[in-house]
């Protein structure tokens, strides 16, 4: 799995975040030799479990291609701030759960790709690592958002993780010299921007 992840990351920033073909290609690389459904949308029902308790039942498999297309169209065209759009995309992607396996990592990677399209610095920030370090909270807020049918708590969690990553990178001496101006502008935007579409 680690070898596969490295291969995806080698090619991720060359991919089009609005292309289902590229998404399927990334999934095929990520899940190569791990599942028979690598590189294909799931064919059956799938649920997300916390232990033995079902916390989310994903939409029917036959709806997945259209739901993913609609989500990609929305994220491409909506005028919302890219930080908000990428976070909403991540939530909706996990809600759709388009693959039999690998949805969490794909959602995090695709959010990174969307953010990279906005500001290339995001291609080099360890946001996914920070989210993985907070995996228990990640799944808790994802479940809470799903239960309430309100994605705000999940979006707030992701925005905080992005902010924390930027602060961590900005405070690292070696990296500060290379990216401090870009990171500082992003931090300023996060602190000063209301992140609305207006």
Residue ranges of predicted features:
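FIC/Doc superfamily catalytic core
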Residues: 1-198
């Amino acid at each position: 799995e680690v070898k596969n992840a490295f291969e995806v990351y080698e090619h991720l920033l060359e991919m089009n975040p609005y292309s289902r073909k590229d998404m399927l290609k990334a999934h095929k690389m990520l899940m190569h030799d791990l599942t028979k459904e690598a590189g294909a949308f799931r064919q059956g029902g799938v649920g997300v479990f916390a232990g033995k308790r079902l916390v989310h039942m994903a939409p029917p498999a036959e709806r997945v291609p259209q739901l993913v297309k609609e989500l990609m169209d929305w994220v491409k065209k909506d005028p919302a701030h890219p930080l908000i759009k990428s976070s909403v995309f991540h939530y909706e992607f996990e809600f759709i759960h388009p693959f039999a396996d690998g949805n969490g990592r794909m959602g995090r990677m695709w959010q990174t790709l969307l953010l990279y399209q906005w500001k290339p610095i995001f291609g080099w920030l360890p946001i996914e690592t920070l989210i993985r370090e907070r995996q228990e909270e990640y799944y808790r807020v994802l479940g809470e958002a799903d239960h309430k049918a309100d994605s705000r708590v999940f979006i707030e969690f992701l925005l905080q993780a992005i902010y924390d990553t930027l602060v961590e990178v900005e405070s690292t001496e070696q990296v500060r010299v290379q990216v401090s101006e870009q990171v500082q502008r992003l931090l300023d935007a996060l602190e000063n921007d209301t992140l609305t579409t207006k």
